């Protein structure tokens, strides 16, 4: 099987350049407002790896980020929509979109959360779903959770210190990280993996 990343760099002849153009705008804009630490967030790593997957034409990278992003971005959209139409957040995590201390143009760039699931479904449909993406994404998330602990409790990147709903923090730290990863895998990653495996299975040998 192997874990080769590259597959067909010509798979997305136009979209790969669109992805590069997006990164040229998005990375400096985000870095100037939120700093480089923000790129440790799972959702922002997903942007970087999706664009890499489009550039390389890699089913493995695109599949892993489809597993990571489709349901998570749907939750983001529901929370933002709830705030917009009902005046309150259902889950939290999109409060910054209404924070006038951040430039409006940069906040609007976060609307990529609405586009990313569609982009990933389209991309995976084009190249096929690689089921190894599920395991790769669990490995990526696990590594990011560990790294996120070094950012400090106040930042709480990727909820590595406390959960976003009840603010609970499990001790010792490995228990909290393991519980967080298990939650991500069971609630977000596994259902998406099963759905994509059924819908966009790649032919044997590819």
Residue ranges of predicted features:
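N-terminal membrane topogenic signal
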Residues: 1-18
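Membrane-proximal helix-loop-helix units in multi-pass membrane proteins
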Residues: 78-140
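Interfacial segments of alpha-helical transmembrane regions
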Residues: 53-70, 128-141
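Membrane-interface transmembrane-helix boundary segments in multi-pass integral membrane proteins
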Residues: 151-189
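Membrane-interface capping segments at transmembrane-helix boundaries
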Residues: 192-206
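Aromatic-anchored segments of alpha-helical transmembrane domains
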Residues: 21-28, 69-80, 140-151
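Hydrophobic cores of alpha-helical transmembrane segments in multi-pass inner/ER membrane proteins
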Residues: 46-55, 108, 112-123, 180-194
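Short, hydrophobic transmembrane alpha-helix segments
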Residues: 28-37
